[in-house]
């Protein structure tokens, strides 16, 4: 199975459980994307994937926002949970019953709560800390 930094996987799982938007940096890009995370799962090549509905930020494809987008979890460099809460995008095509979610599911959002699973390794916050500019002041 693909390996992702445990703290990033833990943050993504929490955002899905709480149905909160996230800001992320992807593949070393400087720009930030804001997405509504809906599911984390292993694909056919055992890569951890995040299915998310991108609502703001950079799009290397040039597609107009908003749109569905899969992200390879291991290519997510930074992630921060935002205050914005979202409802699952059923009208835009999201379904927890999709075949790709049947095997290797880590976390998935459902209304009004979330069906939530977390691998044992992700429960440990052993990865590198988030960069200072992405931490919230207490």
Whereabouts are the PLM-identified features?
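Core beta-strand-centered patch of the WYL/Sm-like small regulatory domain
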Residues: 1-138
